[in-house]
């Protein structure tokens, strides 16, 4: 960490590095990190101000299966103490990480309900986004 930062900021950064699983990579430049670790850096940056709301756009795109599960777990963990809005076209991500589904088609909300009320997400998505 940067020794010029006040101790509270230094501790915050260290806590975030640990929380997102970057402790072993902390002294590397971002460009030297894998895509999965770069995603973690982005999540840590988003968390720096301890926001009540976290908006993530396609946070798992391009990750290998191990990285994918790690990021999913991290996002679920972050969602325990804040609202997380996840934008994705990958329905498996919705099933794995979301408690509520909002499907927007051409700027219009077509579906807005808890995921537990949706029997078949794929079919719901098809019906909500079909062109009439």
Task: Annotate each predicted stretch with a short phrase.
Residues 8-25:
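Conserved ABC ATPase "signature" region
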Residues 94-96:
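A short, surface-exposed alpha-helical micro-motif characterized by mixed small hydrophobic
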Residues 54-58:
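Catalytic Walker B motif of ABC-type/P-loop ATPase nucleotide-binding domains
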Residues 43:
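Hydrophobic anchor residue at the start of the ABC signature
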């Amino acid at each position: 960490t940067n020794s010029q930062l006040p101790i509270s900021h230094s501790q915050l950064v260290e806590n975030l590095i640990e929380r997102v699983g970057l402790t072993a990579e902390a002294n590397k430049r971002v460009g030297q990190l894998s895509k999965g670790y770069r995603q973690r850096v982005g999540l840590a940056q988003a968390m720096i101000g301890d926001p009540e709301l976290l908006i993530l756009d396609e946070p798992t795109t391009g990750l290998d299966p191990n990285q994918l599960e790690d990021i999913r777990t991290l996002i679920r963990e972050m969602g325990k103490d804040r609202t997380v809005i996840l934008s994705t076209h990958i329905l498996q991500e919705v099933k794995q990480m979301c408690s509520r589904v909002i499907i927007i088609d051409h700027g219009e909300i077509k579906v807005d309900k808890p995921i537990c009320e949706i029997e078949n997400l794929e079919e719901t998505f098809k019906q909500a986004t079909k062109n009439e």
